Amino acid sequence: MKRIIFLMLGWGLCLIVQAQTTNFSKLNFGCDGSSTTSGNQWSKTVVDLLGFASHHNVAVGSSTFACHPDTQDYNSDNFAGISDGWKPTKDKKELQMRHNNVSKVHIQKFISEVKDGVYPAPDVFVFAMGSNDTKLDGVAEALSARTLDDVNVTTMAGGARWAIQTILENFPECRVFVWLPIPVSYTHLRAHETGRNL
């Protein structure tokens, strides 16, 4: 079901971007997300169908917008790496790598790869994540922070604000699209299940 929704959203993105320009061969595509975006999934299909010049995807399964208190910066000297692991473990390095699997670190990696010339600067960037986030509070705080240094990145809203604004500040000509999951209450889920069983 999630793949169908993302494919529909991807097709919608294609239509929006196509309305703005007809020649995608000179445009570069970047994206960040979780498991539904990682690798060569919907984003690669969009790039191939529309003929974008490049595809730069830093999405990793199990990722979140919200950082952990011990999340490391991508360029820090002791950076442990990033892991999409999800099975229970007590391995300290693996746990640190999982705590680094957040949009802030992905975006730091993305910018580093662009600055190093590995990939070109993006003309279109899509964030497609949030389904793994559990810290959904802090929206007002994230929006009212004056600078990125003031943003509390340990919430979904703060992490999203930091990531989106960082892309816009580093690539001001880039068009940014954000696809978030639509949260559903437990009551709604139970009603849906009850209706489906009738």
Regions found by a protein language model. Name each.
Residues 1-20:
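Bacterial Sec-dependent N-terminal signal peptides
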Residues 23-150, 154:
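Conserved SGNH/GDSL esterase-like catalytic core that processes O-acyl groups on lipids
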Residues 45, 49-50, 166, 170, ...:
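Alpha-helical structural signal in soluble globular domains
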Residues 51-56, 158, 171-174:
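Structural alpha-beta junctions
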Residues 126-136, 140-141, 163-190:
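Active-site segments of SGNH/GDSL-like serine hydrolases
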Residues 156-163:
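A general structural detector for well-ordered alpha-helical segments in enzyme core domains, enriched
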Residues 188-198:
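Single conserved hydrophobic/aromatic residue that forms the stacking wall/gate
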